[in-house]
C-alpha cells in the first residue's frame, strides 16, 4: 500500500473509538510469568493458533464457517500455565476444536409465526416469518443464516399500529420484557448465557413515536462485522452528523462539487482525535494509527465541511498538540501536517496508559467552548475518535469522563429535547481481545444507527478506511435544506420548481415540480398537452429571475387522460407523472438542490437505513399501514408578494384509506362512476378530509408539486400532486369533509423513473 494509506498494522488489536480497559475476553496477566508457557498440547482440532502480546496471549483461529470452542483466547498465567479450557457454563474441556458456526434461533416472535422451527440453524438455512390477521409485517419476511453467525436482513415485526410507538420487535437471539408501547413505556432486552448484548438493553417510547437508543443484538465472541458493513454504517451515521450541521446550524452550503461551510467563531462541529502512544502500542502501530487518522480527516474533508479539530496523544500523560481554540484547527491540511509531525518517541520516557487523563483534555476543550461562546455552544456537535489498544493501567475508568462530557453538553437531561445529536462516540473494536460489553457501554446509542463495531483484524480495519475513501457512489445532499431564520423560501425548499406553459390564444398555465437531478424536474403529466412546444415551457428555480429552457418532456407511457371517456369518465389521471429534461445542466447552490427520491442510495442514507435495506423495506419505513404525516408546498400571495408555505397533511394509508378514496366519487365529472377503482387506482396516495385532523387541500396551481415526508431532518418525495375532488381555492366557505387530494405514489412508478434517470447517478436500489 502507498504511504498515504492506512497500512497493515500487525496483530496488536487497535480500537478506533472509546474503549475502556480490560479488553481481553480473559483477563490479561498482571505480571509476566516466571517461565514461558509451554506450547505443547495446546493445539486446536481443525484449526491453528498464534501468539499475541509477546507470547502472553494465544489466539485460536478456525477456517471460514467455523469458530474455536470453547474459547478463542487463552492467557499465560503467572504460574507458567495457560488459562483453562472451559465453556460459559464452566464445564472443563480437554481439547479445543473448531465447530461449525450456527445462527441463533428466535427466542420469541410476537403476533405471528416463523418456519421452520429448530433448536439451531446452519449456514445458508432460511427462516420465514408470517403475521396473524390484523397485523402488518415490517422488516424481512425471509432471512438467511450467514457465515458471520448472523441473520441477513432486518428484524421481522408484526404490528397492528395500535401503540403510540411502533412495536420495537424482538431481534433474533434476544428476549424482550414489555408489551405496552404507550408514551414513556419501556421494554428491556436480554441475551442467553454466553452471549453479549450490543445496543440498548432498555428502550423507552418517546414523544414523536420513536424509541430511545438503538436496536439490540446478541453477539457471540466469534462474531465480527465485515468491513463493508462497518464502512456503510459508519459513513451513514457520520454523514448524518456532518450534513446535520449543514441543515440545522444555519450555515449555507455551497454548490454540489465545492460544498463548504464557513463556521462562526464557536464552530459547528468539533472532532477530537486522541492517539494512544503507550508502550503496548509500539512504534509501527503508532505510525499506522496516524495514517488511519489522516484517512479519517480526508473523508470528512470530502464532505466539504470544515470542523475544528483537537489532537491529543497520550501515554502516562497527555500532550495536547492542537486545541479547537486554535484558529488553524479548521484547516484540514494544517491538521494533517501536525499529525505527521508527532512521533512515538514523544512518550518514550513515561509509557504507561492513562486514557482517562487524555479524555479529560477533551473535556477541557469542550469546556473552553462552553465558557467562551455561551450563545453558540449548544449548537456545536462533537465527535470523539480515539485510537488505542484499550489497556489503561492508571488513572481510573475513562467511562466516568464520558458521563461528565454528557453533563457538560446538557445531553440526556431533558426528555423533550435530549440533544443526543450533539455527541457521537464511535467504538471500533479490532481483534480477538475486544471486550464487547465494555465497548458497547461506551458507544453512542441512536435509533437506526450503529456506533459500536467489532472487526476481525487490522486488515479488516484497513479495508474499512479503503471503502470509506474509495466508495464511488454519491453520498448525496438530496433533501437537505437551510432552515436558518435568515433563509429565504428557496433556501428552505431548494428543490421547488415553477413551471409555466404559454399557449397562443389560450393563455397561460402554471404547475409545480421538484428538482430530482442536475438535468431533471419531476412534475405531473396533465400540466402539458400534446400540442405544447418546448419553447413555450419555462422552468423557474431558486427564486431567480432566470428561466431555464427545456429539452423535452417525458411522459409515463401509460398516462392517457382520455383513456376512459367511453365509460363517461372525462378525465383519468392514472400514471399522471412526467419528467422535464432541462436543456442545460443545473449548477447546485444554496437555493437549488435536489429532493430525495424513494428507493435510492441517497434516501436510504437519509433515513440511516442499513446496507442491506431493500426498496420494499424502505417503503415500509416511509409509508407504513397507518396515517402518515406528510407535507406539500403551496405558493400564496402575502403583502403583494409570492411566498412558499409548507402545509402538513396526513396520507391515509391505513384504516382510513378506503373512506378517503371513496370521496373521489364526489368530484365534478365523476357523477356516473359507480366503482371507485375506476378512477382511483393502486398508484394513488390520498390526503385531505377532517379525520383525524382537518387537512389543508391543494389548489389547481399546486399540480405537479411533490408530496413530501420530512424525516431525520431530510425531505423525501413520495408522491406527485395530481388532482383534487374540490378546488377549494375557488370557494369562500370552509372545505367540505369530502375534499380530498390524490397524488401519484412514486413507489408505483419506480421502473419508469429508474429507466429515465439511469444516467443521473442517483443509485436506485
Swiss-Prot record:
The record marks 259-260 as: Cleavage. Pfam families: Sushi. The active site is at residues 526, 576, 703. Mg(2+) binds at residues 278, 280, 353. GO terms for biological process: complement activation, alternative pathway; proteolysis. Cleaved by CFD following activation of the alternative complement system, generating Ba and Bb chains. Cleavage and activation takes place when CFB is already associated with complement C3b. One of its GO terms (molecular function) is serine-type endopeptidase activity. GO terms for cellular component: extracellular region. Precursor of the catalytic component of the C3 and C5 convertase complexes of the alternative pathway of the complement system, a cascade of proteins that leads to phagocytosis and breakdown of pathogens and signaling that strengthens the adaptive immune system. The alternative complement pathway acts as an amplification loop that enhances other complement pathways (classical, lectin and GZMK) by promoting formation of additional C3 and C5 convertases. CFB is cleaved and activated by CFD to generate Ba and Bb chains; Bb chain constituting the catalytic component of the C3 and C5 convertases. Residues 1-25 form the signal peptide. Belongs to the peptidase S1 family. Keywords: Complement alternate pathway, Disulfide bond, Glycoprotein, Hydrolase, Immunity, Innate immunity, Magnesium, Metal-binding, Protease, Repeat, Secreted, Serine protease, Signal, Sushi. This is Complement factor B. Coiled coil: none annotated. Its EC number is 3.4.21.47. Residues 35-100, 101-160, 163-220 form the Sushi domain. Residues 270-469 form the VWFA domain. It is found in: Secreted. Glycans are attached at residues 122, 142, 285, 378. Monomer. Interacts with complement C3b; this interaction is dependent on the presence of Mg(2+). Disulfide bonds join 37-76, 62-98, 103-145, 131-158, 165-205, 191-218, 478-596, 511-527, 599-615, 660-686, 699-729.
Amino acid at each position: 500500500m502507498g504511504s498515504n494509506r492506512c497500512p497493515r498494522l500487525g496483530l496488536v488489536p487497535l480500537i478506533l473509538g472509546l474503549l475502556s480497559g480490560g479488553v481481553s475476553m480473559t483477563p490479561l496477566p498482571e505480571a509476566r510469568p516466571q517461565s514461558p508457557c509451554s506450547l505443547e498440547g495446546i493445539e486446536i482440532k481443525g484449526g491453528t493458533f498464534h501468539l499475541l502480546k509477546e507470547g502472553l496471549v494465544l489466539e485460536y483461529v478456525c477456517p471460514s464457517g467455523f469458530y474455536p470452542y470453547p474459547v478463542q483466547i487463552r492467557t499465560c498465567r503467572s504460574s507458567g500455565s495457560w488459562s483453562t479450557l472451559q465453556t460459559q457454563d464452566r464445564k472443563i474441556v480437554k481439547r479445543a476444536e473448531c465447530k461449525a458456526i450456527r445462527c441463533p434461533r428466535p427466542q420469541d416472535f410476537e403476533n405471528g409465526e416463523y418456519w421452520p422451527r429448530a433448536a439451531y440453524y446452519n449456514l445458508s438455512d432460511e427462516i420465514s416469518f408470517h403475521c396473524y390477521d390484523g397485523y402488518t409485517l415490517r422488516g424481512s419476511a425471509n432471512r438467511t443464516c450467514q457465515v458471520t453467525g448472523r441473520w441477513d436482513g432486518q428484524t421481522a415485526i408484526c404490528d397492528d399500529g395500535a401503540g403510540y410507538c411502533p412495536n420495537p420487535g424482538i431481534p433474533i437471539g434476544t428476549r424482550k420484557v414489555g408489551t405496552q408501547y404507550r408514551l414513556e413505556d419501556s421494554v428491556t432486552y436480554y441475551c442467553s448465557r454466553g452471549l453479549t448484548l450490543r445496543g440498548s438493553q432498555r428502550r423507552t417510547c418517546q414523544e414523536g413515536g420513536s424509541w430511545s437508543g438503538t436496536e439490540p443484538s446478541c453477539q457471540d465472541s466469534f462474531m465480527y462485522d465485515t468491513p463493508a458493513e462497518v464502512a456503510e454504517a459508519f459513513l451513514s451515521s457520520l454523514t448524518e452528523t456532518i450534513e446535520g450541521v449543514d441543515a440545522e446550524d444555519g450555515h449555507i452550503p455551497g454548490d454540489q462539487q465545492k460544498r463548504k461551510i464557513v463556521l462562526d467563531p464557536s464552530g459547528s462541529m468539533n472532532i477530537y482525535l486522541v492517539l494512544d502512544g503507550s508502550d503496548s502500542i509500539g512504534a509501527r502501530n503508532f505510525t499506522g494509527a496516524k495514517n488511519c487518522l489522516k484517512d479519517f480527516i480526508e473523508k470528512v474533508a470530502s464532505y466539504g465541511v470544515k470542523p475544528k479539530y483537537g489532537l491529543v496523544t497520550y501515554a502516562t500523560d497527555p500532550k495536547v498538540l492542537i486545541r479547537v481554540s486554535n484558529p488553524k484547527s479548521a484547516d484540514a491540511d494544517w491538521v494533517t501536517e501536525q499529525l505527521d509531525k508527532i512521533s512515538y518517541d514523544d512518550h518514550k520516557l513515561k509509557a504507561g496508559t492513562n486514557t482517562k487523563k487524555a479524555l479529560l483534555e477533551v473535556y477541557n476543550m469542550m469546556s473552553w467552548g462552553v465558557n467562551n461562546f455561551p450563545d453558540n455552544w449548544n449548537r456545536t456537535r462533537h465527535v470523539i475518535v480515539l485510537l488505542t489498544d484499550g489497556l489503561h493501567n492508571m488513572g481510573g475508568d475513562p467511562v466516568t469522563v464520558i458521563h461528565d462530557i454528557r453533563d457538560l453538553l446538557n445531553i440526556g437531561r431533558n426528555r423533550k429535547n435530549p440533544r443526543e445529536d450533539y455527541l457521537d462516540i464511535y467504538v471500533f473494536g479490532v481483534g480477538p481481545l475486544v471486550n464487547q460489553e465494555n465497548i458497547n457501554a461506551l458507544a453512542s446509542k441512536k435509533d437506526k444507527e450503529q456506533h459500536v463495531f467489532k472487526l476481525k483484524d487490522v486488515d479488516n480495519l484497513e479495508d474499512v478506511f479503503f471503502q470509506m475513501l474509495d466508495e464511488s457512489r454519491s453520498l448525496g445532499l438530496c433533501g437537505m435544506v437551510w432552515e436558518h431564520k435568515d433563509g429565504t423560501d428557496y433556501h428552505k425548499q431548494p428543490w421547488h420548481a415553477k413551471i409555466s406553459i404559454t399557449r397562443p390564444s389560450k393563455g397561460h398555465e402554471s404547475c409545480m415540480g421538484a428538482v430530482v437531478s442536475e438535468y431533471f424536474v419531476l412534475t405531473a403529466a396533465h400540466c402539458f398537452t400534446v400540442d405544447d412546444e418546448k419553447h413555450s415551457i419555462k422552468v423557474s428555480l431558486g427564486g431567480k429571475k432566470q428561466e431555464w429552457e427545456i429539452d423535452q418532456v417525458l411522459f409515463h407511457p401509460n398516462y392517457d387522460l382520455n383513456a376512459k371517456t367511453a365509460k363517461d369518465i372525462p378525465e383519468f389521471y392514472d400514471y399522471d407523472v412526467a419528467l422535464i429534461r432541462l436543456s442545460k445542466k443545473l449548477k447546485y447552490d444554496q437555493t437549488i438542490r435536489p429532493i430525495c427520491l424513494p428507493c435510492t442510495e441517497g434516501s436510504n442514507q437519509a433515513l440511516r437505513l442499513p446496507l442491506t435495506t431493500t426498496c420494499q423495506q424502505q417503503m415500509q419505513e416511509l409509508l407504513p399501514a397507518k396515517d402518515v404525516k406528510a407535507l406539500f408546498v403551496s405558493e400564496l400571495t402575502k403583502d403583494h408578494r409570492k411566498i412558499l408555505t409548507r402545509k402538513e397533511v396526513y396520507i391515509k394509508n391505513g384504516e382510513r384509506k378506503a373512506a378517503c378514496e371513496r370521496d373521489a366519487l364526489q368530484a365534478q365529472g365523476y357523477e356516473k362512476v359507480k366503482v371507485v377503482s375506476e378512477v382511483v387506482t393502486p398508484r394513488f396516495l390520498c390526503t385531505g378530509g377532517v379525520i383525524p385532523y382537518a387537512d389543508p387541500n391543494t389548489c389547481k396551481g399546486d399540480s405537479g408539486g411533490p408530496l413530501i415526508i420530512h424525516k431525520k431532518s431530510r425531505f423525501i418525495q413520495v408522491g406527485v400532486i395530481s388532482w383534487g375532488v374540490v378546488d377549494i381555492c375557488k370557494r369562500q366557505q370552509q372545505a367540505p369533509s369530502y375534499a380530498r387530494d390524490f397524488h401519484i405514489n412514486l413507489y408505483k412508478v419506480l421502473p419508469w423513473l429508474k429507466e429515465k434517470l439511469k444516467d443521473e447517478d442517483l443509485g436506485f436500489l
